[in-house]
Amino acid sequence: MYSANHWGGSFEIAADGAAEDDHSRNMDLDRGALSARQHQLDETQQSWLLGPPEAKKKDKYVDLGCVVVKRKLLWWVLWTLLAAFILIGLPVIIAKSIPKKKPHAPPPDQYTDALHKALLFFNAQKSGRLPKNNGIKWRGNSGLSDGSDLTDVKGGLVGGYYDAGDNIKFHFPLAFSMTMLSWSVIEYSAKYKAVGEYDHVRELIKWGTDYLLLTFNSSASTIDKVYSQVGIAKINGTQPDDHYCWNRPEDMAYPRPVQTAGSAPDLGGEMAAALAAASIVFRDNAAYSKKLVNGAAAVYKFARSSGRRTPYSRGNQYIEYYYNSTSYWDEYMWSAAWMYYATGNNTYITFATDPRLPKNAKAFYSILDFSVFSWDNKLPGAELLLSRLRMFLNPGYPYEESLIGYHNTTSMNMCTYFPRFGAFNFTKGGLAQFNHGKGQPLQYTVANSFLAALYADYMESVNVPGWYCGPYFMTVDDLRSFARSQVNYILGDNPKKMSYVVGYGKKYPRRLHHRGASTPHNGIKYSCTGGYKWRDTKGADPNVLVGAMVGGPDKNDQFKDARLTYAQNEPTLVGNAGLVAALVALTNSGRGAGVTAVDKNTMFSAVPPMFPATPPPPSKWKP
């Protein structure tokens, strides 16, 4: 409290200047000391609340120039990279520096082994001027004068294949054999490559198709005839021909007339199928593939000519007894399917799915024999071929209705293969009697075993586990097991414990009904009847016809290894073509993990996209 100024005047105290300055300096010093003490006090108070001060840390970051990272993270990354190099990189470097041995191919299964041999049969059946690498030492050039009297074929009809144990060239079964080989290559090219037979089988196909192109004017768009056969065999004939004589092909000295067909819906259809299928096989050779397609189109047009609908074999005594065609509607369906796949032209698939075609072919009738695939009945093969289109591409309208019918019929055909349903008889040894106990049963066995294995692979490729036979569900494995059982029978799993493929296994036929195999290759040219002693001898063949599948046993599993029992002991082109197809379908060679059972796409390489064309724009609106 301030006291009152009882004396009057100012409250200020007067002082001299020097004293004033000293006082001010002392006040500044006191403030500085007080401030210092206050700062120390603040730090002390903070220490009470926060604890003792931390020691000053080292710099935690590293400047790499382009980026700044934590020192700890940088060390962690470096150590991780070093560990990865030691664990992964170093072993890889060491492994690559070690010289590698070529990996051993997996051991071939029995089907692969038999396949190598079965293909050699075609080398032995070649006619014409043989290549140096043909591989059959006891075969030479033959048939070099075939068709030499024809004025419209330059060089004659030289080449092709002899049909069986005689020296006739039947063009109908020859064409079917080439179709079968081509189909097997299209579906299973990876397997052929894996077993080293891809180039070989293509060469065999080309040998056949080159010859087929000679049998008509393949450079023309319209033709009026085809040559259907070279060589003849008259029933009970007494004049030299291909049955009366017993000669090696190289020693033939008798007439070999050429048969001509001005009407051939069946033969023309099969030839078109063979050339069209081969054009897909040789799609990597554009010029040759185009040549095949053009030839196929010409002979297909000839086959479909409305004024040429008489079967090629009718009334011809040199054909009708051996390869008589019972219908041509199956060849129409078969060839149309192949022409569509080869060209992508919708005209062919439109015809193949026209409801009138299966009606005329009786494709949807419940006729048991129509379910058996053979050189004479293409219906089961054509139906499966068209089912392929539905299963993989599903084109829908307007083809769907007929394709469903073909697919359902294919499934029913497969049902007939199982003994439990009693459609066909089976021998006690397990062989299906597709031709009802007649001669040459094995050619039917292998053809239908191929279809069974192929259909199983189709279903597996689209993740379908099986299908219904009435109330019974049959699996893909059931179907494949049937095919295996039939082929295994042929390879030796039968009551006779013998292989029906020459050269396969330890026990196989050694007295074939085959002129070339039975007549020694000893430099002697035997006459027409001079070869009879080799026909009639009971000795084994001097030339082993490796890979030849014989006709097969009778309905009681019995087999007579005698040269004159041609129904059992004669091999044929169609038989071996079916055998090759069945073997490549069943072998596991070339099927690695993740590899589909069949080549799904090559067949469709010419087929356009399956979607409708863009509709035309609407017309202009007018009020």
UniProtKB/Swiss-Prot annotation:
Keywords: Carbohydrate metabolism, Cell wall biogenesis/degradation, Cellulose degradation, Glycoprotein, Glycosidase, Hydrolase, Membrane, Polysaccharide degradation, Signal-anchor, Transmembrane, Transmembrane helix. The keyword Protein transport does not apply. Residues 95-623 are extracellular. GO terms for cellular component: membrane. Ubiquitous. Residues 1-73 are cytoplasmic. It catalyses: Endohydrolysis of (1->4)-beta-D-glucosidic linkages in cellulose, lichenin and cereal beta-D-glucans. One of its GO terms (biological process) is cell wall organization. It is a single-pass type II membrane protein. The keyword Membrane applies. Belongs to the glycosyl hydrolase 9 (cellulase E) family. PANTHER family: ENDO-1,4-BETA-GLUCANASE. This is Endoglucanase 12. It comes from Oryza sativa subsp. japonica (Rice). The lineage of its organism: Eukaryota, Viridiplantae, Streptophyta, Embryophyta, Tracheophyta. The gene is GLU3.
